[in-house]
Each structure stands twice: as structure tokens, then as C-alpha cells.
Amino acid sequence: MRKRISAIIMTLFMVFMSCNNGGPELKSDEVAKSDGTVLDLAKISKKIKDAVEFAASVKEIETLVKSIDELAKAIGKKIKQNSEDLEVDNGKNNKNGELVAGAFQVMLTVKAKLEKLGNTPEISEELKGKITDSKSKCKEFVDKVKADSDISKAEATDEHVKKAIDQVNAPAGEKGVVELVKLNKSIGELLKAANAAAEAAIAELTAPVKAEKPSQNN
């Protein structure tokens, strides 16, 4: 995000330097392009800032959702002593309640962040629709997991938990994975739209001046 903000600042500087201040009287936060187009830098800068921050928030949510995949790798495992690897925990196999609780808490955090994101002012109807879809998919996952008696207990088995959170080894898992797959897809589409909105805001500032057509008079 820092790189993107730095690029925006540089773009603002370049636009300012390339604009001329001739023509109509301008306000302190306005500049004019060579074709006479007046840019409200304060307004455009805020629009870019808001769009970039929104996209960063969506990216954070996507990272949280994808972290479930990392938690799934620890199903039935323990840390191998003096190693950076995991190994099967024969003494605690089929006792994944705490692991599921961790994944569930991550998803509750995602749910809360999506709710907050939905209250963002001045976002497009497209983004509002995609947020609503992601909220719905998140709720479906949460509802599925919390209602499953095989999952909501300390002795949750490896097999059952894989069907809840392991997209790799149980892609059709009926205890939550199906809903998790849908949520991942929905969040991915939301992030794509958020990035597009940020790029559009930047493009509004950097749009090239239209070249004047040559005169047809001889």
C-alpha cells in the first residue's frame, strides 16, 4: 500500500507540474490542464485516498479468509521438536476443537470487518452488491459450522474438521468447506472490483489531454 500511495503522490506532483495556470482564475486547490480542463486536486486526491484505503481493507479481509487454509494444514498435527515441520500427533489425533475454534474466530472477525466495510460512504452500487454477497457467504459458513455437533466439540475428528475447513483435501466437504469455497470466490471478486475502483480514481487524475484535431482550412 505504501508503494501505491507514493506513486499517487508522485502522480499528483507530475500533474501539477504539467498543468498551466493560464485562463480562468483558479482556486488554491485547483489546476488547469493545457486544454482548459480544471482539476479539483483536493477532491480527486480524497477520492483516490478513499479508494486505495477501501481496497486495502478488502485485501486484509481476503488475507484473513485465506489464513483458514493455513490452519487446515495443522489438522491432527503438532510441531516436530527442533524442526520447522509439523508431524502427526498420535497422542492428540482427533481432538481438533481448539483448532476449529481458532478458524471460527477468524471468520467472526471477517464477518465484523465486512459489516464495517458495508457502511463505507460513497461507494458504488457494484461494490455494495459485492459486499452484500460476501457477507451472505460468510454468514452461511458461520451458520454451518456453529450448528454442526461434530465440529463444535473438543473431540472434533480429523475427518470432520477437514470437511469443515480443508479446501485442499476435502473440496466438497459438507461441514463448511463448500461454503468456504464460495466465500473465497466472493471475496476475490470483491477485491477485484475494489482494485478496479482504485485504478479508475487514479485514471481520473492521470487521463491524458485530448489532442486537438488539425484545422481543415487551407
From Swiss-Prot:
Keyword Protein biosynthesis among record annotations: no
Pfam families, sorted: Lipoprotein_6
Lineage summary: Bacteria, Pseudomonadati, Spirochaetota, Spirochaetia, Spirochaetales
Extra facts: Genes for both Vlp and Vsp families are on (usually) unnamed linear plasmids in B.hermsii HS1.
Protein's name according to its UniProt entry: Variable small protein 8
Membrane topology: Lipid-anchor
Keyword entries, A-Z: Cell outer membrane, Lipoprotein, Membrane, Palmitate, Plasmid, Signal
GO cellular component: cell outer membrane
Function, in words: The Vlp and Vsp proteins are antigenically distinct proteins, only one vlp or vsp gene is transcriptionally active at any one time. Switching between these genes is a mechanism of host immune response evasion.
PROSITE patterns: PROKAR_LIPOPROTEIN
Family (UniProt): Belongs to the variable small protein (Vsp) family.
Lipidation (S-diacylglycerol cysteine): C19
Lipid-acceptor residues (N-palmitoyl cysteine): C19
KW Membrane (keyword) present: yes
Signal peptide: 1-18
Subcellular location: Cell outer membrane
